[in-house]
Design a protein with these regions (language model features):
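Outer-membrane beta-barrel proteins
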Residues: 1-314
């Protein structure tokens, strides 16, 4: 991805309220078109398009810290989703870590651990309507929350801590989550995370996640487990997933993935998927086919779905 950078000395004071010699502005973007379909399910027009442009600015303070801000202008398939997303302000304090405030968007650290198995396309349960998925996130619609990151405490160790304050309305209590990742052994990645979501009052959701990924030559294998434990009488879900990817060349990758959702009071949802992706410069072609048994825990409800994608980065 090519990034155009422009020195903007005159705008440094306007971008951040600190003393800085110069600010650096970068603009990146992307666009994609896709087609998806399903068996035993009416999906209507399967064609979709997405695009977005990200504006970022950064400057170095007199004490050596770096301050940056970023925002995404994106357009999805519905007019209600048009606008600015992922607005953030980050203070990088060097060995003391970095603190990011998300005015809108962002991803809680545990949300990125929902299924970490290697794939050339999508997770095994994706592209099938009503299939149970996992995507834990801090409450309040991902607005006005904090994330702290530090990778300097120990070689190969990165920690992330999330805090979402209560808003006195939909979120009566604050929500917290955190993860730790270890990459100190060549090719091996280990991760663990936990969190508490109090944004669904009076119900609370406790989340825990563990994963391991190992890459050797052209092969990458991964295992992931993710559990949601709700204070309600039902609704607990545990995901266990495995995946294997193979880099046929520098440009072509293929993968197979399997996932099982254990749903409290329902049948287990079992998913199996195959994916492939081909990268040619800034263009990526992707394809995947997934089959899901007992969709959403409903016994005998079996469906499959597929997706084709073409994306460009600039």
């Amino acid at each position: 991805m090519n990034i155009k950078k422009i020195g903007l000395t005159a705008l440094a004071g306007a971008l951040v309220s600190v003393s800085a010699n110069a600010a650096e502005l970068s603009v990146t973007g992307g666009a994609s078109i896709g087609f998806a379909g399903e068996e035993k399910q009416s999906t209507g027009n399967g064609w979709t398009m997405n695009d977005g442009i990200t504006f970022s600015a950064s400057a170095e303070m007199d004490n050596g810290w770096n301050v940056s801000t970023s925002m995404l202008i994106d357009s999805s398939d519905t007019a209600a989703s048009y606008g600015i997303d992922n607005r953030s302000l980050t203070i990088d304090m060097g060995d003391s870590g970095s603190l990011t405030f998300y005015g809108d968007g962002g991803s809680a650290s545990t949300a990125l651990m929902d299924d970490t198995t290697p794939t050339a396309g999508e997770e095994a349960w994706d592209d099938v309507t009503d299939a149970t998925a996992h995507s834990y996130s801090v409450a309040s619609g991902d607005r006005d929350w904090f994330q702290y990151t530090n990778s300097s405490l120990m070689d190969g160790v990165t920690i992330k801590l999330d805090y979402n304050p209560s808003d006195g309305a939909t979120t009566i209590e604050s929500s917290t989550s955190g993860t730790i990742t270890y990459t100190g052994v060549d090719g091996l990645t280990l991760g663990a995370g936990m969190g508490e979501d109090n944004g669904e009052a009076p119900t609370t959701v406790d989340v825990s996640a563990f994963n391991a990924t190992y890459a050797m030559d052209a092969f990458t294998v991964g295992w992931s487990t993710y559990e949601e434990d709700t204070s309600a009488s039902s609704g607990d879900v545990t995901l266990t997933a495995m995946g294997l990817s193979y880099a046929v060349s520098d440009d072509l990758s293929v993968s197979v993935n399997q996932a099982t959702h254990e749903i409290q009071g329902s049948s287990d949802q079992d998913s199996f998927g195959v994916s492939a992706s081909l990268v040619m410069g800034s263009m990526t072609l992707s394809a995947n086919h997934n089959s899901v048994e007992n969709v959403a825990g409903i016994s005998g409800t079996d469906r499959s779905g597929y997706a084709l994608g073409l994306s460009f980065a600039f």
